[in-house]
Amino acid sequence: MSRVCQVTGKGPVTGNNISHANNKTRRRFLPNLQHHRFWVEGEKRFVRLRVSAKGMRIIDKRGIEVVLAELRRDGKI
């Protein structure tokens, strides 16, 4: 399973760990992904999504039914 938010499309990015001695080693910054069940009132069922914290805030703001309609329109779910 890929580490990508189903709502925002956020995925891992790369960067450096930097030590006190300023040594740099490559690392990955992973998105804050959570598996979350959302109740869809129009369908009378739960939908399970893998979303980032930002994705959850988007769903809180716009509503799960609007976000699901966009995901289905774009073929993401």
UniProtKB/Swiss-Prot annotation:
GO molecular function: structural constituent of ribosome
Residues making up the signal peptide according to the UniProt record: none
Region annotated Disordered, chain positions: 1-20
A biological process from GO: translation
Record keywords, A-Z: Ribonucleoprotein, Ribosomal protein
Record flagged with keyword Ribosomal protein: yes
Family: Belongs to the bacterial ribosomal protein bL28 family.
Protein name: Large ribosomal subunit protein bL28
Organism: Pseudomonas syringae pv. tomato (strain ATCC BAA-871 / DC3000)
